[in-house]
Design a protein with these regions (language model features):
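Conserved short beta-strand edge segments in small beta-sheet-based binding/regulatory domains
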Residues: 257-273
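Short, intrinsically disordered low-complexity segments
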Residues: 70-115, 119-120, 126, 196-253, ...
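Surface-exposed beta-loop interaction hotspot
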Residues: 118-205
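Short, hydrophobic/proline-enriched secondary-structure or compact coil segments at domain edges
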Residues: 39-45, 172-174, 230-239
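Ordered, small/hydrophobic-rich secondary-structure cores
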Residues: 2-3, 24, 28-115
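Short amphipathic alpha-helices in soluble, non-transmembrane regions
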Residues: 185-192, 245-260
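Short acidic, S/G/P-rich loop/turn micro-motifs used as interaction or catalytic elements
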Residues: 48-49, 179-182, 238-244
């Protein structure tokens, strides 16, 4: 079976989603930098064999612009294949923008995708008989088919002017596919010290949190989007101009994304509204 046929078979397999154990201690965003730079997922096996090994793993990374917005998404997967050469693991790395898109758009496939840590991906890779998971520099060499995003100008969400005492105001949205459980909401509320939103009559904003870093004020809303997705809307009110601003924003966006992945959601894109 060649890699192209194998991608189709992996995509069509029946859903089976075991409960993920990816539950590290929550941390306040901005207080530490996540260690791995890539996002990892386990593809679970078919429903007919729930106790068997995972079907494969996925490594992904957003392509980011200077301001932290996503212009594309790179990904590669390792899955089992029939007919591998003697002595080699019966699997291979492959890259497919179509599969990357389907992980987010197809509910059946999404039900078989579990967000995991780098450590758990390493364990799954060994369980698949593939040996030690390559380092992230090597994994990036397997990214051959980028999923491109629309490069249109930012939308406007809220007033464009910075509040008094700040020189710039930016609004970002991290969009996620998947369902957030009640337990997940409790975990996020505790980790982010969120307060309930009392000024959203439509009930779309579940909670709000904020943090101050080096004179910059960051606040974010956890929001339901259309009843089918979730987002974290980050507002950055920037104090004195600094060459470090871009790095601080990208780090915070990364930490917010990681926290949502811990609760089983899959990041779709990072947009800027102002």
């Amino acid at each position: 079976m060649d890699a192209e046929t194998h991608r189709s078979e992996t995509y069509r397999s029946e859903p089976n989603l075991p409960e993920t154990t990816y539950r590290p201690e929550p941390a306040r965003p901005g207080m530490r930098t996540p260690e791995p730079e890539l996002d990892y997922y386990v593809i679970t096996g078919e429903a007919a064999a729930p106790a068997g090994p995972p079907a494969g793993i996925v490594a992904e990374e957003f392509v980011l612009s200077d301001d932290g917005t996503a212009t594309g998404l790179n990904g590669a997967a390792w899955t089992r294949m029939d007919g591998a050469a003697g002595g080699a693991p019966d699997g291979a790395w492959w890259s497919s923008a179509e599969f990357t898109r389907a992980m987010r758009a197809d509910p059946e496939l999404r039900g078989r995708i579990v967000a995991v840590s780098r450590h758990e991906a390493e364990a799954a890779y060994r369980r698949l008989g593939a040996g030690e998971l390559p380092g992230e520099a090597t994994l990036r060499t397997y990214f051959h088919d980028t999923l491109p995003f629309d490069g249109s100008a930012p939308l406007r969400l809220g007033p464009p002017d910075a509040p008094e005492g700040f020189h710039d105001r930016r609004v970002y949205r991290i969009l996620f596919a998947g369902d957030l459980s009640e337990t997940g909401l409790v975990n996020l509320s505790a980790g982010w010290r969120m307060r309930a939103a009392d000024d959203d009559a439509r009930g779309r904003v579940v909670g709000t949190a904020h943090i101050t870093l080096a004179g910059d004020l960051f606040s974010w809303d956890l929001r339901r989007v259309g009843g089918m997705a979730w987002s974290v809307d980050l507002t950055a009110c920037l104090g004195e101009p600094s060459p470090r601003t871009g790095g601080v924003i990208r780090r915070l966006l990364r930490e917010l994304t990681t926290a949502m992945r811990r609760e089983g959601l899959i990041p779709v894109t990072i947009e800027r509204f102002s």
